[in-house]
């Protein structure tokens, strides 16, 4: 039994071995066949890649050859062009060289010819000079013989005759010199006159300014007729306080739609006009409020004057200038002379003077500065009541202005001789600006002078603080200092002022003199919590 099992096991084992061998052989054949297939595929792919690479290389070689041929052709074409251009340039240079050589030969021939001619002329001149020397010697000898012969028959010596001849020549030369001087002076005057006309014509042609006329009244519209009573106030206190502090007349239209402010002093009227506008807009109109607003407007107006002056200085390119002078320049906007605005007139003079000075070779900037400041004193005349020339000189000297400016202020009214081109330009420009037709009117200026004269008379008395000419000169309101004038002195001062007006003025009519003395006390109460 056991041997039979062993026999079966051996058979099975042999069968397994045979099967394994068969499987091994089959798998080997399979793998071999697969390897051969892979090798064949790889070989085919390698051959394909080799073929593609070979084709690519051949294509690149063909492209490179084509590119090389193309570049070779371009090079040959470019070389041909350059060679052609070079040949043309070379031919042109050879032509120029030939022309230059021909020109040099011609010049050389011409110079040789000129040299020969000059040599001939030199020889001729040498010959003529020798002949002249001989002739001169002969003439001197003949002159000496003639002089000796003449002296033998005359009573004068040689020196006396020479002196007589020289005196006669001197007289003739003096007469000729006088005639020449007179002729040149006449020609110079005529030429100077023509030149001055030309300069003035060019200056006026290049300048065009604005012109303003004087208006002695300002009209302000009222929101409604109720404001008439509010402006007048209880028992007229508001309007009296307004007149007292501003020095301006105030009247109402018949339909109570507007009020009219009038004063010969335009700056004073402008401050009053702004004050009444603010009061009407605010609605609170009472004496204390009027005084407060008036002082605030006056301070603001001074700032506006400085701004106006700075604008003028900047417009005329004058450089630096003291603030006081700028304020006075701005204030000239509210000053009229013979109906002509002082600031506009001064700007005209400055611009014209600059143009004229430039034509005459002077300092344009300095001429403009002298032109804008030549009437600066007019901004102070209504307050200080003196001649505007002296006032202008004082304020300009105080701020160390250039002597040319001082000379222009004096010279434009004939107080000094003209010392410079710039000063002469200012005087000419002033005459042009003031002398044009319609520039000035005398009636307004005479009225302003009459009003100013009344105020100046009152201000001459001791104790007088302010004086306002009102009602077109029919009333003079005088405010005295309460700490210097007593109540019993007020009528005396009023009578003295009235008498002085009667003696000093020559106008027909009556002037009412109203003297006001006021005591005002102010204290402060401290509230405790």
Curated annotation (Swiss-Prot):
It comes from the Bacteria. It holds the Pfam family RNase_Y_N. Residues 216-297 form the KH domain. Its main location: membrane. This is Ribonuclease Y. InterPro entries: HD/PDEase_dom (IPR003607), HD_domain (IPR006674), HDIG_dom (IPR006675), KH_dom (IPR004087), KH_dom_type_1 (IPR004088), KH_dom_type_1_sf (IPR036612), Ribonuclease_Y (IPR017705), RNase_Y_N (IPR022711). HAMAP family: RNase_Y. GO terms for biological process: mRNA catabolic process. One of its GO terms (cellular component) is plasma membrane. Belongs to the RNase Y family. Keywords: Cell membrane, Endonuclease, Hydrolase, Membrane, Nuclease, RNA-binding, Transmembrane, Transmembrane helix. The chain crosses the membrane at residues 4-24. It is a single-pass membrane protein. The keyword Transmembrane helix applies. Endoribonuclease that initiates mRNA decay.
């Amino acid at each position: 039994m056991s041997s039979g099992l062993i026999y079966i096991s051996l058979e099975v084992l042999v069968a397994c071995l045979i099967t394994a061998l068969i499987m091994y052989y089959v798998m080997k054949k399979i793998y071999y066949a697969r390897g051969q297939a892979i090798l064949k595929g790889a070989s085919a792919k390698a051959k394909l890649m080799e073929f593609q690479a070979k084709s690519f290389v051949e294509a690149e070689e063909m492209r490179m050859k084509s590119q090389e041929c193309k570049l070779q052709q371009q090079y040959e074409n470019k070389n041909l062009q350059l060679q052609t251009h070079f040949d043309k340039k070379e031919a042109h240079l050879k032509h120029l060289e030939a022309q230059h050589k021909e020109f040099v030969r011609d010049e050389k021939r011409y110079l040789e010819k000129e040299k020969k001619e000059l040599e001939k002329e030199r020889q001729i001149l040498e010959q003529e000079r020798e002949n002249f020397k001989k002739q001169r010697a002969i003439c001197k000898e003949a002159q000496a013989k003639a002089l000796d012969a003449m002296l033998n028959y005359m009573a004068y010596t040689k020196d006396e005759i020479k002196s007589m001849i020289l005196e006669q020549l001197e007289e003739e030369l003096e007469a000729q010199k006088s005639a020449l001087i007179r002729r040149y002076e006449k020609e110079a005057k005529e030429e100077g006159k023509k030149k001055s006309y030309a300069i003035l014509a060019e200056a006026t042609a290049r300048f065009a300014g604005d012109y303003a006329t004087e208006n002695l009244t300002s009209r302000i519209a009222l929101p409604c007729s109720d404001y008439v009573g509010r402006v007048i106030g209880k028992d007229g206190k508001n309007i009296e306080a307004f007149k007292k502090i501003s020095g301006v007349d105030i009247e109402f239209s018949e339909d109570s739609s507007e009020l009219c402010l009038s004063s010969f002093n335009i700056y004073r009227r402008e401050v009053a006009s702004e004050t009444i506008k603010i009061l009407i807009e605010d609605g609170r109109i009472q004496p204390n409020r009027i005084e407060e607003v008036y002082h605030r407007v006056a301070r603001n107006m001074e700032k506006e004057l400085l701004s106006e002056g700075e604008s003028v200085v900047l417009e005329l390119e004058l450089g630096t200038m003291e603030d006081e002078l700028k304020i006075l320049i701005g204030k000239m906007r509210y000053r009229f002379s013979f109906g002509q605005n002082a600031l506009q007139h001064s700007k005209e003079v400055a611009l014209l003077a600059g143009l004229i000075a430039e034509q005459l070779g002077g300092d344009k900037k300095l001429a403009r500065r002298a032109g804008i400041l030549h009437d600066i004193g007019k901004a102070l005349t209504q307050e200080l009541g003196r001649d505007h020339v002296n006032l202008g000189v004082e304020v300009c000297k105080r701020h160390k202005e250039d002597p040319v400016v001082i000379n222009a202020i004096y010279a434009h009214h004939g107080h000094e001789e003209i010392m410079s081109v710039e000063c002469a330009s200012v005087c000419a420009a002033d005459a042009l600006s003031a002398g044009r037709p319609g520039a000035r009117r005398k009636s307004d200026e005479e009225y302003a002078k009459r009003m100013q004269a009344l105020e100046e008379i009152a201000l001459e008395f001791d104790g007088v603080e302010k004086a306002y000419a009102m009602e077109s000169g029919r009333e003079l309101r005088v405010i005295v200092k309460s700490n210097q004038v007593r109540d019993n002195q007020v009528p005396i001062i009023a009578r003295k002022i009235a008498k002085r007006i009667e003696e000093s003025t020559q106008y027909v009519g009556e002037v009412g003199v109203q003297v006001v003395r006021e005591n005002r006390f102010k204290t402060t109460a401290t509230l405790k919590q």
